[in-house]
Amino acid sequence: MALDGIRMPDGCYADGTWELKMHVTDLNRDVSLRVTGEIHIGGVMLKLVEKLDVKKDWSDHALWWEKKKTWLLKTHWTLDKYGIQADARLLFTPQHKLLRLQLPNMKHMRVKVNFSDRVFKAVSDICKTFNIRHPEELSLLRKPRDPKKKKKKLEDAEEETLELEGPLLTPGSGSIYSSPGLYSKTMTPTYDSRDGSPLSPTSAWFGDSPLSEGNPSILAVSQPITSPDILVKMYKPQSLLDKAKINQGWLDSSRSLMEQDVKENEVLLLRFKYHSFFDLNPKYDAIRVNQLYEQAKWAILLEEIECTEEEMMMFAALQYHINKLSIMSSDNHMNNSEKEVDEVDAALSDLEITLEGGKTSNTLGDITSIPELADYVKVFKPKKLTLKGYKQYWCTFKDITISCYKSREEAHGTPAHQMNLRGCEVTPDVNISGQKFNIKLLIPVADGMNEIWLRCDTEKQYAQWMAACRLASKGKTMADSSYNLEVQNILSFLKMQHMNPDPQIIEPITTDINPECLVSPRYLKKYKNKQPGFVRDLISARILEAHQNVAQMSLIEAKMRFIQAWQSLPEFGITHFLAKFQGGKKDELIGITYNRLIRMDAGTGDAIKTWRFSNMKQWNVNWEIKMVTVEFADEPSLAFICAEVDCKVVHEFIGGYIFLSTRAKDQNESLDEEMFYKLTSGWV
C-alpha cells in the first residue's frame, strides 16, 4: 500500500493530507477533496469546481462553515488560519438568496439579498433597489409570533403576498454606501411633489430591474385596506410588555443574515427602526414618504401607539382623503404630467421633517433678546392623599425656566415656584371638544422626577407654552429658529381635530368609506357599545366631519401631515425593552428615543427617570451578565440588565441614534459605514 493511502487515527493521511467534506447546495451533492491545511480558500473552491465539472457560473458562490456559523470570504486565508480540520463540514452555496420582505405597507416582495453581507450593508442594497434614501434609518426585524395562533402554516396562509422580485444585488459594491442625492441639495426631482408619482419613466430609476416590468410605483402608492377582517387577523400587542417582545426581533446590523440563522425564503420585516427621519423631501422621497405613512398608519390601526378619540378621527379622515386621492391620482396622472406645483412646494417647505422637527427661518428676528412668555396659567402638583386641584399663577417663561408668582404684580419679587425644564419629559393631554389643554411635565430631580401639570385656556396659549416646553427640555430657548414653526405645527395639529360640521359641505355618507378599516378595533368596539345598530353611520359621520379640515390638501401633503401628526403623539419614537435596573427589585422598561433613555413603569408606561444623550459621557456592555452601564457628565451612572433580549439590540439602538445625530446636509454624499459599526457593534 502506498504511503499516501494510509489513514491515521486523527483522519489525516500519512502524507499530511486529509479529506475535506463539502456539500454543494445547488446540486444537493456531497463532495470530498484531499487537501492540506496550507491550501487557501480560493484554491479549495477552484479544486471543487474542477471536480464538479458542471458548466455553470459559480462566481456568486462561497464557502460557509456550518459549525462555526462563519463565511469563509477571505480567499487568501489558508484552512489552517481559519482553524478548519478534518471534522469540518462546509457548504458551497450562493451568497445571494431570496428573501420575502414585508414592507411597512404590509405587502410582501421577493428580493435577492446578499446573505454574506452585514445586515447594515444588505439593508442599504435593499433600499437602493427600492429607491429609498437614508437606508441607515431602516433595518430588518423577525416577524413576531401571535401567541393566539399556534400553527405557523395557518398564519403564513393568511398573508397577502405581492410577488414582485427585486433585482439581483451583486456583492463588492464597496464598504461605503453611496447613492445619488443621499445628502445632495442639487438633485433632479424624481417625483411630482403633488401626488408623488414618478416624473421620469420607471426604468430611469429602477434600471433593468424586474421591478420595472411590474409596477414599481406601487411602492409610492397607498393602497386602502379592503376588509376589516385584515385588521382582525393581524397581531396587535396588548401591553407594553408585548411591544417590548416585538423589539427582541431586531437583527444584529453587524452580522450577516446567514450568521443569524435566517433561511432562504424566510419572511423578514423591513421597517423604519430609528425614528429620526432626515431630510424628508417629497420631490425625491415619494416611496420613502409613502412607506413612512404606511408604517404610521398600521402603528395606529394595530394600537401599537396610543391616541385619543379625536386624534383617531383625524387620522381616519386623513386616511380616507389619501385613499380617495390615490385612486384619482392613478387614474389622472397620465393626462396631467405637467403641473403647476409652486404653491405645493411652498406649503411643503414647512413640512420637511428633520431631527429637530423644523428648519431655519428665513427671518433673523431680534437676535439681541430671547423671547419670553408671561401669562396666567393654572398649575397642579399632584401628591398622594390630596384633593387640591389646579391653582392659578402668573407664570413667566424665560430661557428654559418657568417662574410662578401669586399675581402679576408680584412678578418682580421672589417666585412662589420655579422650574428648570432641561431634561424634562413633556406630554400633551388635550381634548378639543372639552376645551382641555394640559401639559404634563416630569422634571428631573435627584431621586427621580417631579410631576407638574400646566393648564392653558386657549389653543394659542397651549401651542406657545407647549412649544417652549419642548425646546426647553432639549436645553433650547424660544430664540431657537424652530420655535415659531413648532407653534404653527401644534396649532395645525389641533385644527385638524376640530369638529365643526357645516351641513353645506359635508359629503353624503357613501358605501366606499369603510369606516371599520379606518379606525382601530378599540374605538370600533367603543362605538358598538354606545349605539350597536348605527356604528357604521356614526363613525362615517365623525370621519366626514373631520375630513373638512383636510379636504383641500394634496395627496403628498396629506401623507406628510399624517406623519407629522404621528410624530406629535406622546408615545412616538419610544422603543421599549424589558430591563432590571441596578438596585431595583422588579422588571421595568427601558425606553430609547432619538435623544434620551427613559426608565418606565412596566405596567403604566409612566416615566420614572430620564437621561439625555447630550449629557452622556460613554456607555459600556458587560456581555457575560448582559449589563449595560451608562456614564453621565453630572449625575450618577445608570446600569441595567437586559431581560428576554440580547443586550446587543439595546446597545445598537443607543449607538445607532448617536450615529444618526452626526448627520448634516452639508456633509459629503457618502455614509460612513465603519463609524456605524464602531458605535454599534461592540467589538470592532
UniProtKB/Swiss-Prot annotation:
Region of interest (Interaction with membranes containing phosphatidylinositol phosphate), residue spans: 40-81
Q: Where is the FERM domain?
A: 279-577
Question: What molecular function does GO assign, one term?
Answer: integrin binding
Q: How does it sit in the membrane?
A: Peripheral membrane protein
Chief location category? cytoplasm
Explain what the UniProt record notes about the effect of disrupting the gene for this protein: Morpholino knockdown results in severe defects in embryonic development. Nearly all embryos display pericardial edema. Most embryos display abnormal body shape and size, defects in heart morphogenesis, impaired mobility, and die at about 7 dpf. The embryonic cardiac muscle and skeletal muscle show defects in the association of the actin-myosin myofibers with the myocyte membrane. Likewise, morpholino knockdown results in defective angiogenesis, with abnormally short and thin vessels and very little blood flow.
Entry's Gene Ontology BP terms: angiogenesis; cardiac muscle tissue morphogenesis; cell migration; cell-matrix adhesion; cytoskeleton organization; integrin-mediated signaling pathway; regulation of cell shape; Wnt signaling pathway
Has keyword Nucleus?
Answer: yes
Lineage: superkingdom? Eukaryota
User: Where found?
Assistant: Cytoplasm; Cytoplasm, Cell cortex; Cytoplasm, Cytoskeleton; Cytoplasm, Cytoskeleton, Stress fiber
The segment(s) forming the PH domain are 378-474
Q: Where is this region: Disordered?
A: 141-163
Query: Which CDD domains does this one have?
Result: FERM_F0_KIND2, FERM_F1_KIND2, PH_fermitin
Question: One GO CC term of this entry?
Answer: lamellipodium membrane
* Keywords tagged on the record: Cell adhesion, Cell junction, Cell membrane, Cell projection, Cell shape, Cytoplasm, Cytoskeleton, Lipid-binding, Membrane, Nucleus, Wnt signaling pathway
Task: Answer yes or no on keyword Nucleus.
Answer: yes
Which positions make up the signal peptide? Answer: none
Residues noted as binding a 1,2-diacyl-sn-glycero-3-phospho-(1D-myo-inositol-3,4,5-trisphosphate) in the record, renumbered to the chain: 381
Domain remarks in the Swiss-Prot or TrEMBL record: The FERM domain is not correctly detected by PROSITE or Pfam techniques because it contains the insertion of a PH domain.
Function statement:
Scaffolding protein that enhances integrin activation mediated by TLN1 and/or TLN2, but activates integrins only weakly by itself. Binds to membranes enriched in phosphoinositides. Enhances integrin-mediated cell adhesion onto the extracellular matrix and cell spreading; this requires both its ability to interact with integrins and with phospholipid membranes. Required for the assembly of focal adhesions. Participates in the connection between extracellular matrix adhesion sites and the actin cytoskeleton and also in the orchestration of actin assembly and cell shape modulation.
Q: Which family does it belong to?
A: Belongs to the kindlin family.
* Protein name per Swiss-Prot or TrEMBL: Fermitin family homolog 2
| Organism from which the protein derives | Danio rerio (Zebrafish)
Gene giving rise to this polypeptide: fermt2
